[in-house]
Amino acid sequence: MQETIRNTFKSVRQASRELVMIGEQAINSILIDLAETIPDCSSSILEANRRDLDRMDPADPMFDRLLLNEKRLEIIAADIRNVATLPSPLDIVLEQRRLPNGLELKKITVPIGVIGIIYEARPNVTFDVFALCLKSGNATVLKGGSDAHESNTAIVECIKTVLRRNGINDNTLSLLPSEREAAGIMLNAVDSIDMIIPRGSQKLIDFVRQNAKVPVIETGAGIVHTYIDKNADTGIAAKVIFNAKTRRPSVCNALDTLLVHAAKLDDLPQITAPLQEKKVVIYADEAAYAKLQGSYPESLLERARPEHFGTEFLSLKLSVKTVSSIEEALDHIAEYSSRHSEAIITNDPEAKAEFLKRVDAAVVYANTSTAFTDGAQFGLGAEIGISTQKLHARGPMALKELTSYKWIIEGDGQTRSV
């Protein structure tokens, strides 16, 4: 396997060199062609997806992420068309100046080169990643999870068909075997891969970070908090909490822990009442549990254990903790946050300003849902993930974050004397 994968990396690297010479118009045409081809590929993709789904328990939080259907494929095709309409992130002049010796300097955006993606049971990521990487001039190596391997294989074949039809080296995109050994080879491919982005659980991200020699940008895992301040509007709190928890509980911007100021506990039954509709299980600390008893369904209410406050649930589960001050809320977030998305609900301008200033996260909200952490919602177009680190990229990683830069220097015979 090792030799085969290394040969794959060489082919992808060659394809990345060829990709540099493909113009923006040609890239956009390929993306439009792919969007129009998805309906033709849908039967083979959905058949493969069904085989993957048959091996997974429908109660598994990953089931919804794995699921593809006609509607989701239509949305994917629309997203790809949207990427085609976005401005190219390449060849943008970031700096330009003329030196006293006559040299002309330009700093321009360029592709990163070869981007590796390690991800779990999310076959839609295969389409998203390809579209964004192609638009930004990057070749791509994919290492998907075994749960989605048949879906990913069908999707990659659909994409490669489009590449070949447009005269593009189909090694621009390669899918590695689903075995764990392939991930290890990829993480050490410093001569072949320029950057790796893991998308998935904290366990996956930790594995990549601890074992990679290739530079890594961490994305995805979100232990997300919303703090209800003592001066919060109860109606806004109820609406925001319901949306943040139940819109899509299996995604990384979904709410995991609700922090409630002790002075606001009397309103907790009203705030959590809408969650009953979706049968959200609440793990409450003693004070919150006592307040919810008799108002929240007994079958959905449990006492919280310490581990509940460090868990990304990815399902219809929510931990609730009572705090005595904004300071205690900030301390709790600092201890448990994955630095993804954090929110405060308050009518107090000073509390809001303090929270927004002091919380260390990629995205910090006031009086709105954390569900907005999304490249499309930010007006960035599609995203390749949500970076939770600080170097190179932070927050939604869109086209700009998939580029680097280089200096172009032009002269007419100048030589350096000193």
Swiss-Prot record:
CDD domains: ALDH_F18-19_ProA-GPR
Catalytic function, reaction form: L-glutamate 5-semialdehyde + phosphate + NADP(+) = L-glutamyl 5-phosphate + NADPH + H(+)
Main localization (coarse): cytoplasm
Record key words, sorted: Amino-acid biosynthesis, Cytoplasm, NADP, Oxidoreductase, Proline biosynthesis
This protein's record includes keyword ATP-binding: no
Transmembrane segments: none
GO MF term (any one): glutamate-5-semialdehyde dehydrogenase activity
Subcellular location as annotated: Cytoplasm
Gene Ontology CC terms, in alphabetical order: cytoplasm
SUPFAM superfamilies membership: ALDH-like
Record-linked InterPro entries: Ald_DH/histidinol_DH, Ald_DH_C, Ald_DH_N, Aldehyde_DH_dom, G-glutamylP_reductase_CS, Glu-5-SA_DH, GPR_dom
Domain of life: Bacteria
Pathway participation: Amino-acid biosynthesis; L-proline biosynthesis; L-glutamate 5-semialdehyde from L-glutamate: step 2/2
EC number(s) stated in the UniProt entry for this protein: 1.2.1.41
One of the protein's GO biological processes: L-proline biosynthetic process
Entry annotated with the keyword DNA repair: no
PANTHER family linked to this entry: DELTA-1-PYRROLINE-5-CARBOXYLATE SYNTHASE, GLUTAMATE SEMIALDEHYDE DEHYDROGENASE
Its biological purpose: Catalyzes the NADPH-dependent reduction of L-glutamate 5-phosphate into L-glutamate 5-semialdehyde and phosphate. The product spontaneously undergoes cyclization to form 1-pyrroline-5-carboxylate.
Similarity remark: Belongs to the gamma-glutamyl phosphate reductase family.
Entry protein name: Gamma-glutamyl phosphate reductase
Name of encoding gene: proA
